[in-house]
From Swiss-Prot:
Annotated protein name in UniProt: Vitamin B12-binding protein
InterPro entries in the record: ABC_transptr_periplasmic_BD, ABC_transptr_vit_B12-bd, Vit_B12_bind_prot, Vitamin_B12-ABC_binding
Pfam families: Peripla_BP_2
Keyword line: Disulfide bond, Periplasm, Signal, Transport
Domain of life: Bacteria
Signal peptide (from-to): 1-20
Provenance organism: Vibrio cholerae serotype O1 (strain ATCC 39541 / Classical Ogawa 395 / O395)
GO molecular function: cobalamin binding
Amino acid sequence: MLVIRLIACTFLFITPSLLAKPFPAERIISLAPHATEIAYAAGLGDKLVAVSEYSDYPPQALELERVANHQTINIEKILTLKPDLIIAWPAGNPPRELAKLRQLGFTIYDSQTKTLDEIADNIEALSHYSANPEVGQKAAHDFRQRLQDLRTQYASNQPIRYFYQLSEKPIITLAQGHWPSEVFSLCGGVNIFADSEVPYPQVSIEQVLVKQPQVIFTSEHAIANGHMWRAWQAELSAVQNDQVWALNADWLNRPTPRTLDAVEQVCTYLKIAQKQ
C-alpha cells in the first residue's frame, strides 16, 4: 500500500507555484523523488544538499542526505541545513509539516504535474533558480520536441483497450484524467475503467473479466501480477495472446523527463497488441 500511496499522491494536481521571485539558489532541498529529478534536469543538481527517500535518479542523488518521506519531514534537520530553496510536493508531503516550513519563512517551490506538457513547464520554472537557466531551458525545449515527435509518430495508432494494475491486494487501477493516463492515451490506449467515479478505483477480477482488456499492464512494483493473471488465461484474451506487460514504474509514475521513456515503452507494447 506504500507504493500505491506514493503513486496516488503524485497524480494529484496543483499548478507549480512560486512563492517568491526566482533567484540563483545555492542550497536546495527536494522533498519528493520526482522533484529531485526535475531539479537535476533544471541544472540545479550541484546545489542540492538533501532530498527525500526514494530519490534514486540520477545516481548521484543517492549520495545526498534524506530529510523526508511520505509520512514525515525532518524539520529539525532542514533547519540545520539552512536551504535557500525547498522544492515541495504539496499533494504528497505531510501538510502540517509543510505548513510549518512555510511559517518558518523558507522559500518554497511547489512541484506538481498533471499533464505531459507541464513536465517541461516545471523544468523551465525551476531553471530560473539556477545561475545558468539556459541548462533547464534547453532540457525543457528538448522535452517538448521529443514529446511532439512521439505524438506525431503514434498519432495513427488504433484504439486498444487496456487495464493498468497498480497493486494486487487489493487490485487498484486508475480512472481517465489522472496521472499517468495521458501516457496510455497518447499511444492509443483506451482505459477500461475510464468512467470510474473515483480516481483510483479498487476493482475485482470479475470486473476485469467482464470488460475484457486487450492488454494488461502491471508495474515493476507489482511484478507478480503478471503471474496472477495466468490463472485466468481461459477467460482473458490478453493473457491468451501474451499481452501482459510489466512497465518501468519510475518512468511511468514520476512526472519527469524519463516519462517519455514510459511513452515509448507503452506505445511499443500497444503496437504489438494491435498487430494481433
